[in-house]
């Protein structure tokens, strides 16, 4: 019994070391510009920009295939930060991709929900929990407010509630000029 346990532990150590070596040896380097652009985007994964998520949109911006003003959840502040990062001229938010709205979170009226799971399938960040023919609910901290769960609901039990500003959620609304150290 003890020898079998030692053999299993040795196998686990060898496989762990092999995986660690492979992760270092075969690392795929990403484009640092794409990572910087992606860090500025709001990570709502809403698709309002015409791309399936924030990372593909960041790649398109870096490759020059998309404009910097297509992200309504990022708002004017996001466009300003992207313009500063890329050295481009600021453009107002594109109206064809939507308008900037205050941050909102989805809520499900649990008395009306029929448990069809359509909202579960539509949520890009898995912020909705529930099972078939069971009540569903939204995990507030995970919800990005993308509104993709609202349209598929057959009984209209999902509504968007604006997030009230608290000490934890308040953000400075005005452009911030970064002060750089003199060389």
Swiss-Prot record:
Class of enzymatic activity (EC top level): translocase
Q: Which SUPFAM superfamilies match?
A: 4Fe-4S ferredoxins
Q: Which GO terms describe its biological process?
A: electron transport chain
Name the Gene3D superfamilies on file: 3.30.70.20, Electron transport complex subunit B, putative Fe-S cluster
Q: Which Pfam families match?
A: Fer4_21, FeS
Q: Where does [4Fe-4S] cluster 1 bind?
A: 46, 49, 54, 71
Alphabetical GO CC annotations of the entry are: plasma membrane
What keyword terms does UniProt attach to this protein?
Answer: 4Fe-4S, Cell inner membrane, Cell membrane, Electron transport, Iron, Iron-sulfur, Membrane, Metal-binding, Repeat, Translocase, Transport
Q: What is its EC number?
A: 7.-.-.-
Name the residues that bind [4Fe-4S] cluster 2: 113, 116, 119, 153
Domain 4Fe-4S ferredoxin-type: residue ranges: 104-133, 135-163
Task: Write down how the cofactor binds this protein.
Answer: Binds 3 [4Fe-4S] clusters.
- Write out the similarity annotation: Belongs to the 4Fe4S bacterial-type ferredoxin family. RnfB subfamily.
Q: How does it assemble?
A: The complex is composed of six subunits: RnfA, RnfB, RnfC, RnfD, RnfE and RnfG.
User: What is the protein's known function?
Assistant: Part of a membrane-bound complex that couples electron transfer with translocation of ions across the membrane.
Q: What is this protein called?
A: Ion-translocating oxidoreductase complex subunit B
* The organism of origin for this protein: Azoarcus sp. (strain BH72)
Q: Which gene encodes it?
A: rnfB
């Amino acid at each position: 019994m003890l020898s079998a346990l030692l053999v299993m532990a040795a196998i686990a150590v060898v496989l762990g070391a092999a995986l660690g070596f492979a992760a270092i040896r075969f690392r795929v380097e990403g484009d640092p510009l794409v990572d910087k652009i992606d860090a500025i985007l709001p990570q709502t994964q809403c698709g309002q920009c015409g791309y399936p998520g924030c990372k593909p949109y960041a790649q398109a911006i870096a490759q020059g295939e998309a404009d910097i003003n297509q992200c309504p959840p990022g708002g004017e502040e996001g466009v300003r930060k992207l313009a500063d990062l890329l050295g481009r001229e600021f453009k107002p938010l594109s109206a064809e991709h939507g308008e900037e709205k205050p941050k909102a979170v989805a809520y499900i009226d649990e008395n009306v929900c029929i448990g069809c799971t359509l909202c579960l399938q539509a949520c890009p960040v898995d912020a909705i929990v529930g099972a078939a023919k069971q009540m569903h609910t939204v995990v507030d901290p995970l919800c990005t407010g993308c509104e993709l769960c609202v349209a598929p609901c057959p009984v209209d039990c999902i509504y968007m509630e604006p997030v009230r500003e608290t000490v934890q959620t308040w953000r400075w609304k005005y452009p911030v000029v970064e002060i750089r150290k003199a060389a």
